[in-house]
Amino acid sequence: MNILIFGPPGSGKSTHSRTIMEKYGLVYISSGDLIRREIERKSSLGREMEAYLSRGDLIPDTIVNTLIISKLRRQRENFILDGYPRTPEQVISLENYLFDHGIKLDLALEIFIDEDTSVERISGRRICPNCGAVYHVKYNPPKVPGICDVCGSELIQRADDREEVVRKRYRIYSKNMEPIIKFYRAKGIYVRVDGDGPISEVWKRIQPLLDYIHSREEKRKEHE
């Protein structure tokens, strides 16, 4: 089972991706994780990508395509791609790779939330720069405002979590996703799920769809 999962900032797609990975035994490939690892390495490429993100801009397609395709070459089947492709050029790169290697996508899933929900979820996030603990000023606040419960360090707001940056990211996402959604809808594999509400409620909307696809794939393998 090969899945693409999309969603605007704060949609919860990465959380659901990990649940899907664990439940269905898929390999999780996240464009965000690959980018963050490169930034943490403080390589010249990482610094270049960090500059784009701090402005709320998308990282150039050539960079993202290289990161993702390199990862896919090590995992031909049974994957979930989180946050990729997100531009028409990335779609072309991915589709060419899949065609060349005889790989079929089963689902392009979008978890949708509106712009104000995206801003509330993301701009309230606070990170501990020392131990990596994550908080939210509304949904998961620290015991002492601005201070990490775990190590006592002062919490920070990441540059790309600021409200003005989140709104810019949301609008870029919405604009770029229009042709991508149209493409995968035409292929008959696009499904949009309402991402509003608690994670557990959203999962109840997603799971029946994945169970159906998983069951279909298992039956297909039995008859091969």
Swiss-Prot record:
It catalyses: AMP + ATP = 2 ADP. Residues 30-59 are annotated as: NMP. Its main location: cytoplasm. Disulfide bonds: none annotated. The keyword Ion transport does not apply. InterPro entries: Adenyl_kin_sub, Adenylat/UMP-CMP_kin, Adenylat_kinase_CS, Adenylate_kinase_lid-dom, P-loop_NTPase. AMP binds at residues 31, 36, 57-59, 83-86, 90, 158, 169. The keyword Repeat does not apply. It is found in: Cytoplasm. Pathway: Purine metabolism; AMP biosynthesis via salvage pathway; AMP from ADP: step 1/1. GO terms for biological process: AMP salvage. ATP binds at residues 10-15, 125, 134-135, 197. One of its GO terms (cellular component) is cytoplasm. Its EC number is 2.7.4.3. GO terms for molecular function: adenylate kinase activity; ATP binding; zinc ion binding. Keywords: ATP-binding, Cytoplasm, Kinase, Metal-binding, Nucleotide biosynthesis, Nucleotide-binding, Transferase, Zinc. Zn(2+) binds at residues 128, 131, 148, 151. Residues 124-161 are annotated as: LID. Consists of three domains, a large central CORE domain and two small peripheral domains, NMPbind and LID, which undergo movements during catalysis. The LID domain closes over the site of phosphoryl transfer upon ATP binding. Assembling and dissambling the active center during each catalytic cycle provides an effective means to prevent ATP hydrolysis. Some bacteria have evolved a zinc-coordinating structure that stabilizes the LID domain. Monomer. Belongs to the adenylate kinase family. PANTHER family: NUCLEOTIDE KINASE. Catalyzes the reversible transfer of the terminal phosphate group between ATP and AMP. Plays an important role in cellular energy homeostasis and in adenine nucleotide metabolism. This is Adenylate kinase. The gene is adk.
